[in-house]
């Protein structure tokens, strides 16, 4: 069957002009005009999408099939062009019968030409074919318009859905024109209103926690500059942490007798609830004879030294992708969970604005991965925000997953961000050593976002920087009061 693209070529119908007319009609629609006025950043993103629209319209015309009636008429016209005037006069009754049978718009005009001229001359033959061709061009142009109008309606419906989605998410995720462009590209997926409203919800939560948003922006845009000390530079106070052995809550090492109420074994605590044994419990408490967990580890104290002030700064290090690990243990539920998810959303905003990748890993008893900056970033973000934090804590697996990811060539300059309350077992030595190697040799930076003031020093000391956001009730009230 004849395709519309072939018919356009045969009749020299310019499809480009028709396509441009449809594009201009689409851009002039009231829906787009209002949207561009409300979200000017997204106007450029939609303008960059125009080549894709043109290609979609061309593809529609290229693949479209010409109706059988029009195909038969075109084939008859082509055959008639090859006939001389004498042969054409012989075939003329069959041609007129065909035009009437196909209900061709040219049938009446053709019959009138024949009836009004007793003699069919070569000039009349040429005029007959010229008007027939003109009729075919009109029919072909109308068919082009019909198909492109259907495509325009479908395209407008798609654009309206994407505009609704992008308009809702633009205040949350689009910081600049580049971010708006990437957000528009991501909006091509099939999403329902109830899905992306989850992103809006956490965006509103982030707006209510300006300190958390500010912290995410500081972390996301922190860069270390290369520097050298200047001669005769003044001295400044430099504080370092020095490790020394101590009995601190680091690792369970056994059982001992003491009066440490916080480390009581459950059986000892149970005796306190038995009336007959209550006095016995107090006696053993005074004599420090209660069975408690024995904890050993390493403590750190601050050492103050003097060193020359660093003055000269050179080029800043390039900013690479984010690899964000989020603790989904039970202790991270509730307000901690909201803060962790909102923090990741803020990092996604930074990544979109700075053209960086943002890779999320959830760790509890297993590792789940999401990439928030890819073509399906919005869908991935919705899946991440839908997760519930109810697992255990396996921070060692988290670090091993980060180390494995950083071995890839595309992650050679990545920054690792671990969001947790850091109430967990100490890290194995092989993990600590590998992290140190990545920091020294490959200049990877490891950031900790501590959601609790009780994180274990043995875990947190391996990070290059610790960003603290205490989610305790006292800190939350203080932050609200300061606002």
UniProtKB/Swiss-Prot annotation:
Keywords: Chaperone, Cytoplasm
Designated name of the protein: Regulatory protein ViaA
Organism field: Citrobacter koseri (strain ATCC BAA-895 / CDC 4225-83 / SGSC4696)
SMART domains in the record: VWA (SM00327)
InterPro entries, A to Z: Uncharacterised_CoxE, Uncharacterised_ViaA, VWF_A, vWFA_dom_sf
PANTHER family assigned: PROTEIN VIAA
Assembly and interaction partners: Homodimer. Interacts with RavA.
Classification lineage: Bacteria, Pseudomonadati, Pseudomonadota, Gammaproteobacteria, Enterobacterales
UniProt subcellular location: Cytoplasm
Domain of life: Bacteria
Entries under HAMAP family matching the protein: ViaA
């Amino acid at each position: 069957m004849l395709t519309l693209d072939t018919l356009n070529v045969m009749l020299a119908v310019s499809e480009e002009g028709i396509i441009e007319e449809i594009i201009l009609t689409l851009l002039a629609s009231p829906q787009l005009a209002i949207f561009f006025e409300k979200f000017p950043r997204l106007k450029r993103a939609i303008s960059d999408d125009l080549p894709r629209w043109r290609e979609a319209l061309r593809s529609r015309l290229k693949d479209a099939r010409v109706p059988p009636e029009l195909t038969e008429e075109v084939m008859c016209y082509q055959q008639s062009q090859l006939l001389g005037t004498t042969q054409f006069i012989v075939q003329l009754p069959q041609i007129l019968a065909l035009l009437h049978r196909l209900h061709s718009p040219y049938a009446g005009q053709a019959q009138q030409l024949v009836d009004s001229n007793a003699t069919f001359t070569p000039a009349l033959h040429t005029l007959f074919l010229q008007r027939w061709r003109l009729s075919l061009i009109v029919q072909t142009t109308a068919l082009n318009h019909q198909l492109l109008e259907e495509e325009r309606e479908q395209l407008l419906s798609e654009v309206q859905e994407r505009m609704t989605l992008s308009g809702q998410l633009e205040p949350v995720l689009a910081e600049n024109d580049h971010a708006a462009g990437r957000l528009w590209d991501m909006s091509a997926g099939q999403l329902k209103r109830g899905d992306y409203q989850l992103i809006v919800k956490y965006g509103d939560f982030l707006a209510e926690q300006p300190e958390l948003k500010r912290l995410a922006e500081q972390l996301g845009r922190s860069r270390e500059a290369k520097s050298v000390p200047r001669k005769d530079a003044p001295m400044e106070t430099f504080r370092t942490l020095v490790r020394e052995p101590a009995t601190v809550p680091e690792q369970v090492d056994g059982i001992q007798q003491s009066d440490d109420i916080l480390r009581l074994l459950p059986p000892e605590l149970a005796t306190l609830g038995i009336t007959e044994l209550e006095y016995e419990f107090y006696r053993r408490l005074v004599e420090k004879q209660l069975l408690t967990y024995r904890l050993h580890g390493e403590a750190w104290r601050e050492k103050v030294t003097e060193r020359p002030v660093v003055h000269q700064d050179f080029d800043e290090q390039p900013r690479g992708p984010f690899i964000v690990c989020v603790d989904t243990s039970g202790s991270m539920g509730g307000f901690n969970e909201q803060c962790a998810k909102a923090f990741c959303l803020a990092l996604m905003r930074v990544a979109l604005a700075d053209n960086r990748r943002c890779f999320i890993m959830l760790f509890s008893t297993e590792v789940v991965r999401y990439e928030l900056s890819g073509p399906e970033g919005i869908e991935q973000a919705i899946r991440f925000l839908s997760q519930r934090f109810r697992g255990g804590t396996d921070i060692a697996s988290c670090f091993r997953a980060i180390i494995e990811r950083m071995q890839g060539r595309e992650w050679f300059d990545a920054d690792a961000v671990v969001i947790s309350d850091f109430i967990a077992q100490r890290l194995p030595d092989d993990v600590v050593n590998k992290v140190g190697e990545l920091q020294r040799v490959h200049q990877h930076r490891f950031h900790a976002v501590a959601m609790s003031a009780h994180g274990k020093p043995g875990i947190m000391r391996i990070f290059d920087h610790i960003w603290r956001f205490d989610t305790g009730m006292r800190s939350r009230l203080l932050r609200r009061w300061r606002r």
